Amino acid sequence: MYVLLTILISVLVCEAVIRVSLSSTREETCFGDSTNPEMIEGAWDSLREEEMPEELSCSISGIREVKTSSQELYRALKAIIAADGLNNITCHGKDPEDKISLIKGPPHKKRVGIVRCERRRDAKQIGRETMAGIAMTVLPALAVFALAPVVFAEDPHLRNRPGKGHNYIDGMTQEDATCKPVTYAGACSSFDVLLEKGKFPLFQSYAHHRTLLEAVHDTIIAKADPPSCDLQSAHGNPCMKEKLVMKTHCPNDYQSAHYLNNDGKMASVKCPPKYGLTEDCNFCRQMTGASLKKGSYPLQDLFCQSSEDDGSKLKTKMKGVCEVGVQAHKKCDGQLSTAHEVVPFAVFKNSKKVYLDKLDLKTEENLLPDSFVCFEHKGQYKGTMDSGQTKRELKSFDISQCPKIGGHGSKKCTGDAAFCSAYECTAQYANAYCSHANGSGIVQIQVSGVWKKPLCVGYERVVVKRELSAKPIQRVEPCTTCITKCEPHGLVVRSTGFKISSAVACASGVCVTGSQSPSTEITLKYPGISQSSGGDIGVHMAHDDQSVSSKIVAHCPPQDPCLVHGCIVCAHGLINYQCHTALSAFVVVFVFSSIAIICLAVLYRVLKCLKIAPRKVLNPLMWITAFIRWIYKKMVARVAHNINQVNREIGWMEGGQLVLGNPAPIPRHAPIPRYSTYLMLLLIVSYASACSELIQASSRITTCSTEGVNTKCRLSGTALIRAGSVGAEACLMLKGVKEDQTKFLKIKTVSSELSCREGQSYWTGSISPKCLSSRRCHLVGECHVNRCLSWRDNETSAEFSFVGESTTMRENKCFEQCGGWGCGCFNVNPSCLFVHTYLQSVRKEALRVFNCIDWVHKLTLEITDFDGSVSTIDLGASSSRFTNWGSVSLSLDAEGISGSNSFSFIESPSKGYAIVDEPFSEIPRQGFLGEIRCNSESSVLSAHESCLRAPNLISYKPMIDQLECTTNLIDPFVVFERGSLPQTRNDKTFAASKGNRGVQAFSKGSVQADLTLMFDNFEVDFVGAAVSCDAAFLNLTGCYSCNAGARVCLSITSTGTGSLSAHNKDGSLHIVLPSENGTKDQCQILHFTVPEVEEEFMYSCDGDERPLLVKGTLIAIDPFDDRREAGGESTVVNPKSGSWNFFDWFSGLMSWFGGPLKLYSSFACMLHYQLGSFSSLYILEEQASLKCGLLPLRRPHRSVRVKVIC
């Protein structure tokens, strides 16, 4: 007995009875009159996925209460059907709201119960009473119609329909009895589904207007031709074209669905018998174990009314919309965005379906017949159905039988005040009672600024194609019309109209920046040594207008370093002796001599005025001067003696006198080397670094073995090497067991960056509001008491629920407006203007805003492994990357920058970066960037509700029946275009990093970088014999004592793919270059500290070494630059510690002059000319003429006098 009792108590499917405890008489009952066990499974299928209370307390006839679980619903339902004569069972949840959820459904608007309850009240209490108590009673039996979803409606007269009240579709005859017309007691699935909570909120707000099926039967809306699209034979049928652009959802148990098509007519889709519509309403599925409803499912949320407003000349415009469904609004040639959207529409007389950009509704209450509901009671005395009844039920009454004021009618009617103001209300026993239908009246919508009365109005989810309302940010494109000129003073870039505020020029991994007041022309310094070496220079320019940055590649030819780096009065112009012209040499000598004379004269005058024993002070100066003159005379005499000795040996002088006449020519022989003492001074060793940094793999990490002619070496361990400067290479040399077995691991420093380490970030975009409004009179819909004043932003009015179910950002408002007849209301209390506002993205793109919490150095390295394969990696401080031979990590010693907290940055995923001149804000603030911020790009594009907003962003202006909503948001795209990088702030230039992967800063900094190479049992094979090659020296260009270095180029002819290695005699210098089959020119960066380079290398590709002489003249480039410039340059990696050195320079000067003797002679000439000590020198041969300008003058004397012109 207890087991049976437990099973019976587990019942959750019950018939709900609402009992209201008021002083007046009222009774509400739930009932059923038959059972149908075969329909239990179908009912359970529709209920088992619903949310129900976890625990229920149930009691049988109030005797005993037992807790049970809702999971027992299915078995308990079968037990109830099998049992007869059970007593009433009452169930409730943990809190009173659970009782309501069994009828209404849980907060997610789902239904749990499977019975329909109906309320009956006294006529005088209709429209005035409220619910006071709730109870649930399970009856012994369930009615067949009770297996439909629950409909809970506060208005008991929703089934009292206007017009004929027919809600059936042709061909579905099984429900004609209950749907033709809809009655208080009958079940009509085509109509009942419209009253399910949350499914059709617009119709439920205007439920006393006609449904689409009712409008068709009342000849308000016509049927389509053909009226129905049979899915069984719809393959290729054009009737499905419009249906397929709609996004719909159908329950599993409907066989047909209907909608308002593009022509403003009703169309439908249906399945053959025993088939039901699938979830998307596009296919038919055979159903077993469940009965199919013969009603038709509505695919749109709409209501209809009678109207005579003509819409044939009506033209509407939807901003930015190209197509809606199958309607083409305008031709769009640009980029389109396609999505399913909830779009309002309306149908007018003599018009097709009209889609609306927004829906503004207003209702005017009137005294037309459709505004009233009339009813009588079944079994009523002298009623139309006066037979005995077992239940209390109502029956609709035709209002046309009631007499109007001053008119006649066949029946006597009574009703509320509104009814009695238009109809004769009898004081006698009435046949029917009539009252004003809540929410009825003439509904008008605003179309093109005019209020018009539509036949039907509603919402549907349909495909919408929109053009991008604002042009997307253009990519950084090459400026094809810009002009570049390689001028001696810098690289000049001229635009074709836009003004340039800043620019970045890069070449060979070195970048320089420049900023100025906006102008159509900008002059940039040449990066590195590109001015003399030539080549391509990439320039990235920032504009001052609303367009983004642009770029251009300038090509400069190689030029003479002396021409491009020369000057008359400057530090590098002075020390670059090989570049002096006659003018610059004269200026230098004159300036230095004048400075010396002036200093001595001033010193003498000061000492003389102070009378501080000037003779005692001058005596040392005199002695020094005399000593210098003595040395000078001795050197001149020595030179004259040597010249005379040569003349005597060749026979030009006899007894100390020159021989007159023209002696016979004497055969010339190679000169005897008599200046060995002086030539010793030319043996000056110059330092160079070829592979910038080179180490040889030690035996501790190398193990080699020989297998025939092949050698295999295994590397396992760690090697530490300094990174090369930008453009240079660091090399690890691996030698096999043979002399010709050498391979290299080369790591080239491609570029260096001071990159931004990002902190917080958010996504933002261009967002605009869209507002929907509807004015309802007092006591209509949700406009009760002071509800409007207490309306919450997250509370959506019922008529906007269909739109409000989306996940976009939205808010709701209610504004009290005027009431009374002047405002179209019966009630003089204020009406309610309900507003639903949702935000939408204007552009189909989003921007990311971030700040930089730190600036870190990063190197881009190009690694060429032992087999010649090349890979490029990026490494930051203390970071590592794995390779096929092991791993490489980077250690940096550098300083960052500060002062970047006062601005933030914007990133466009495809267009680059921009700077914002305001600090990063952690919370959205009105009037600043990021008023609306989201956590992802997709959230911005969909204006998702998870986005954060600053308060009070939307301003409202209510105007009785309509409303304007506006925002004044900061447009991040305008900010992006205005601040597009590169830009200069705080004497630092910010630009996009290489590959557009971040933001970098230029600050003239330097880093000390070390690379740690970790080898993990990596094998290197030396297979067969090495290839042979020949190399010839081409040229040497660049600078000395500089970070850019010099570039040595060789012409290499090889029989195969391999590598050329070269070293000097003592093994301190190495050059490593790849060799390929054929002849190819290869270059490598070296660093020298002397201007005159002459170094002999031994090169080899196959172990057979041959000599190679590298010789050339280098110049100094700005060794001293104390000017302060805004912007800066790219970071220098491992700057050369050796600066310009006087002794190295002097040794180079002697080498350039041809030796110490020629250097002495040249300076002696200049000194002689300056001091006037000597007027001429005697030499005997023209080939002894000095470089400073010795011109031989022949005279008719025995001797040859040479006039000195210095």
Curated annotation (Swiss-Prot):
Instruction: Give positions of region: Internal signal sequence for glycoprotein N.
Output: 131-153
For this record, an example GO cellular component is: membrane
Q: Where is this region: Fusion loop?
A: 777-783, 819-830
Residues carrying covalently attached carbohydrate according to the record = N794, N1035, N1077
Region entry Golgi retention signal: which residue ranges?
A: 608-650
Q: Which GO terms describe its biological process?
A: entry receptor-mediated virion attachment to host cell; fusion of virus membrane with host endosome membrane; symbiont entry into host cell
InterPro entries xrefs: M_polyprot_prcur_phlebovir, Phlebo_G2_C, Phlebovirus_G1, Phlebovirus_G2_fusion, Phlebovirus_NSM
Q: Where is this site: Cleavage?
A: A153, E154, A690, C691
Segment forming the signal sequence:
1-16
Q: Give me the ranges of the annotated region Internal signal sequence for glycoprotein C.
A: 675-690
Q: Where is this region: Important for correct targeting of the glycoproteins to the Golgi complex but not for heterodimerization?
A: 646-650
Q: Matching Gene3D superfamilies, A to Z?
A: 2.60.40.3770, 2.60.98.50
List residues in topological domain: Cytoplasmic. 17-130, 604-673, 1181-1206
Q: Which cysteines are cross-linked by disulfides?
A: C179-C188, C229-C239, C250-C281, C271-C284, C304-C456, C322-C332, C374-C434, C402-C413, C420-C425, C479-C482, C486-C556, C506-C511, C691-C731, C704-C713, C756-C852, C771-C965, C777-C825, C783-C832, C788-C814, C818-C823, C934-C947, C1029-C1101, C1039-C1042, C1049-C1083
Lumenal domain ranges by topology = 154-582, 691-1159
Family according to the record: Belongs to the phlebovirus envelope glycoprotein family.
The name this protein goes by in its record = Envelopment polyprotein
Origin organism of this chain?
Rift valley fever virus (RVFV)
Its organism's taxonomic lineage begins at: Viruses, Riboviria, Orthornavirae, Negarnaviricota, Polyploviricotina
Task: Give me the gene this protein comes from.
Answer: GP
